[in-house]
Amino acid sequence: MNGYFRLIAAFALGVATVSGFAPFYLYPIPVVTLALLALLWRRSRTPGQAALTGFTFGMGLFGAGVTWLYVSLHDFGHMEPALAVLALIILCAYLALFPALTGWITAFRHFRASWAWPGMVAALWALAEWLRGTLFTGFPWLTVGYSQAPASPLAGFAPVIGVYGLSLLLMLSAAWLACWLENRQSHRFWLGLGSVWLIGFGLQQIHWTQPEGEPVTVSLLQGNIPQNMKWQPEHLAATMQIYAELVQESPSRLIVTPEISFPLFYEQAPQDYLALLAEHARSRQGDLLIGMAERSSSDNGYYNTMFSFGTSPEQSYRKYHLVPFGEYIPLKPVFGWIIDVLHIPLSDFSRGGLDQQPLDLAGQQVAVNICYEDVFGEEIIMQLPQASLLVNVSNDAWFGRSIGPRQHLQISQMRALETGRYMLRATNTGVTAIIDERGRVLEQLDMFTTAGLHSTAQGFGGATPYVRFGNSLVFALIGLLLLAGSLAAFSGRRKTL
């Protein structure tokens, strides 16, 4: 294949892979695009050519999939258009290094000639995605396993091996398909592919967790405060009035407002206003969660915090996993100038504790996570199995009308699948939704509307295998596949595919 055509094809495959994610949910597409990528790797003349192919695929995937970053940087961060485009290109180039590394390793002749090559590709791909989601605080957005939530048969594996396990099985399926495309005389690849997907379907029939107690009434509030107005002092009174009305119209025991609902510090909030809202929650024998910034009592730092008011004793949750360059500046001596460029309010938060306990609210044990935190499944499970409900609060107004909010919703669907718990999402502009323990969106509000979502949610007890073991199971699977691939490649018994 001509070198330029190869790169164009790889880029197009990366772009097409985005259709597997929300809002499109075309989960079979990534199987095909990854299979064709694997075929390009198998037909690469050198590992370097395979690495460039993987890099170009990554540029297509991330270039098309995280376009919302431009909206955040330019429309709301007021970064110059050229600088915002440059920042997007640099991020995509960094993220594309991980599929490039996978292609480079798997294209070595010893591995490519081995019968264990599909397993090697799958293991290395999953390992690369885990590294991408971990290094430099991690950016696991568009991990391909998310594309399978919630409808794909592979989603049945989510409560067992999590999103990285789904990535592994998705790439394994794709690699088997690539080998069949290369050698259509052999049908054993279909046996492996069909077996994995059939097992996934069977796992979907298992209920790993059990309902506990009666369903609780919930109200998830969506204030729809425009991002370009939220931090303007002259709009503070209107914002507080909107949420006061939404709270007082809520008939539920558990009422949740979005992340930093009020653009002020907790210490600055009018106490009579908070008392009024708390009294409404108590009148329903329930509790209210409000998002505000909180000053540290020990230093000059501040936290992104959710506070509870109502029947239960006052409690709080402080955000632990902060967004780099959005909520804190890494390596300040090097990158401190970015604060002046982005014009993002409160862009240097302090980190909350990692070992925070669920909040006891409205008769439920509630594991709160704020915005970006629900991208990290291994951190969400730290409050389980004690928690009976998951709550994510967010301000996805930063994404504008891009595909970002829908992608974030799908990430929450994966967390519900992994944990066997309802996920309640309260966001500023959308998508505010109730997701059941199977990852299905039961109810949601229209985006960019001011409203409350009033419904019920069922608390769950018990633990999925993923809650018990985290990523340990997928690491064990990665290790076994890499060991098998290495032994097959270097033992002198390299039976070709």
Curated annotation (Swiss-Prot):
Pathway of action: Protein modification; lipoprotein biosynthesis (N-acyl transfer)
GO function term, MF aspect, one: N-acyltransferase activity
Enzyme active site: E259 (proton acceptor), K319, C371 (nucleophile)
Location of the protein in the cell: Cell inner membrane
Keywords: Acyltransferase, Cell inner membrane, Cell membrane, Membrane, Transferase, Transmembrane, Transmembrane helix
SUPFAM superfamilies cross-referenced by the UniProt entry: Carbon-nitrogen hydrolase
Domain of life according to the entry: Bacteria
Parts of the chain that traverse the membrane: 21-41, 51-71, 85-105, 119-139, 157-177, 189-209, 472-492
Domain CN hydrolase: 221-461
Purpose: Catalyzes the phospholipid dependent N-acylation of the N-terminal cysteine of apolipoprotein, the last step in lipoprotein maturation.
Family stated for the protein in its record: Belongs to the CN hydrolase family. Apolipoprotein N-acyltransferase subfamily.
NCBIfam families the record matches: lnt
Name under which the protein is recorded: Apolipoprotein N-acyltransferase
Source organism per UniProt: Nitrosomonas europaea (strain ATCC 19718 / CIP 103999 / KCTC 2705 / NBRC 14298)
Gene from which the chain derives: lnt
